[in-house]
Amino acid sequence: MLKDTFTFQGPLGEIECVVEPNRSENNAVLVMAHGFRGSRDSGGRAAGVAQQAAAHAAVVRFNFTGTQIISRQVEELHAVLAEVRSRQPGCSLFLLGRSLGGAASIITAAQDGALAGLILWATPNDLRFTFRYVMTEDEYRRLDSGETLHFNDERGECDLTPDFLTDFDQYDLPALLQKAQPLPVLLLHCSADEVVLAEQAQRNAAAVGEAAELHIFAGGDHSFTQYSDEAGALLSDWLGKRLKCGAC
């Protein structure tokens, strides 16, 4: 059973995985993927959510190695899943993705085909629409026309190359959600999300169909500042029910 932090060689470099040990007897693991320019800590909230979810499964958190290109993040996510399976054979494996990490998780789940469940936290349905919405008109135009953008702010330095956008074009997220069925999907979103509009969660749920469980929290923001504990409790209960009912 996974208990301790571990490091392995991923496709783009070393990946360190922090483990919240499973407090149950379930042979189950939840892997968490962070959002755009985020981290496995998510301002401290991710550790709290992991502690809640560990009532039913070991929880693995990691940082993408710096790439913002979603195809490369998918490669790293597949590598983490493979490493978890090698370290805990036969486990029921769940995937939680936040924001852009949720989009990477949708792609990964559709390609993997053997996950026990998927949790989408503030996850977009249309990637280009999302970034056209949150970037300035000038930033989006420059990036879309082939210019590299450099950011240096409170989250550090980051270069966005034009293939950040063009890489999105090969992925139809609603179609991938449909391909992943009958995978159970829990969707968590805040109605006042200022980055990924709540209507995107509704479209994701519609794409999933009967296997979707959608919860939209009144007000709130993209970071779930008001609702992190409540959302964590809800997803922990969902994990417990999925494992108890034997659907995994």
Regions found by a protein language model. Give the residues of each.
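Glycine-rich nucleophile elbow surrounding the catalytic serine of serine-hydrolase chemistry
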Residues: G97-I107
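The alpha/beta-hydrolase serine catalytic core
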Residues: I15, F94, A103, D112-F217, ...
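Short, surface-exposed "cap/lid" segments of acyl-processing enzymes
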Residues: L12-E14, R23-A55, V59-F64
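Short, surface-exposed alpha-helical segments at coil->helix boundaries
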Residues: G43-A47, S71-V74, A198-Q202
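N-terminal cap/lid segment of alpha/beta-hydrolase-fold proteins
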Residues: M1-S24
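Catalytic nucleophile-loop/oxyanion-hole region of alpha/beta-hydrolase
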Residues: V60-C91
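Aromatic pocket-lining residues of Rossmann-like dinucleotide-binding sites
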Residues: A53, T108-A109
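Short beta-to-alpha linker loops that shape the active-site pocket of alpha/beta-hydrolase fold enzymes
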Residues: F36, N63-T67, P124, G220
